[in-house]
């Protein structure tokens, strides 16, 4: 059977679409660049943040206006995270990168730990090993419902503070109406005042 040229363009279009969806998101911002993450700057307005995310080819962009949040997907090394941009008085204040949330007994070791490790390795490669750190915790070590979670790594840099954490919290299950314990890893990127 001969290859039909009529199939070449649709296949090429499909392949390029798959590659763009699987491509890595932008990396962490350089020190002293003035950027929090990617090309997002402290003080960017809601419209500017949305425009930069669209132009940066981020996907699944949505807003929670009542909470001052803009969210989208981030992908690094095959892992999917969620970027949350926190706005205060319509100005970007900080960014939070959150791993997948899960509740199954195997989730913590099989999904959360590799996501956390991927984030840690990216941060060490970018900002160096000079930080406060401790090992990945056992689930029972993670404080339940504490917004700060269990801090595993923190970088106190000239222009930003980075904190990598593991969190545990309860969410009401819509099917059983019972509280279910979830966990995830998070990375807080907080620019320093005046920087």
Q: Which ranges hold each PLM region?
A:
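Short, compositionally biased low-complexity segments
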Residues: 24-25, 90
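Bacterial N-terminal signal peptides
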Residues: 8-17
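Short, recurring structural edge motifs at helix starts
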Residues: 33-40, 106-110
């Amino acid at each position: 059977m001969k290859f039909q040229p009529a199939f070449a363009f649709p296949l090429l279009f499909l392949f390029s679409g798959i590659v763009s969806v699987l491509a890595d998101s932008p990396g962490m911002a350089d020190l002293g660049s003035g950027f929090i993450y990617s090309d997002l700057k402290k003080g960017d307005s809601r419209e500017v943040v949305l425009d930069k995310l669209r132009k940066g080819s981020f996907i699944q962009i949505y807003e929670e206006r009542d909470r001052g949040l803009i969210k989208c997907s981030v992908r690094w090394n095959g892992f999917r995270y969620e970027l949350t941009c926190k706005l205060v008085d319509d100005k970007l204040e900080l960014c939070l990168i959150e791993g997948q949330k899960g509740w199954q007994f195997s989730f913590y070791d099989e999904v959360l730990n590799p996501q956390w490790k991927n984030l840690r390795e990216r941060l060490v490669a970018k900002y160096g090993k000079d930080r406060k750190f401790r090992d990945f915790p056992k689930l029972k070590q993670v404080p339940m419902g504490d917004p700060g979670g269990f801090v595993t790594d923190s970088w106190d840099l000239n222009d930003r503070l980075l904190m990598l954490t593991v969190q545990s919290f309860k969410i009401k299950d819509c099917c059983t109406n019972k509280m279910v314990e979830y966990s995830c890893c998070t990375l807080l990127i907080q620019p320093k005042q005046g920087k």
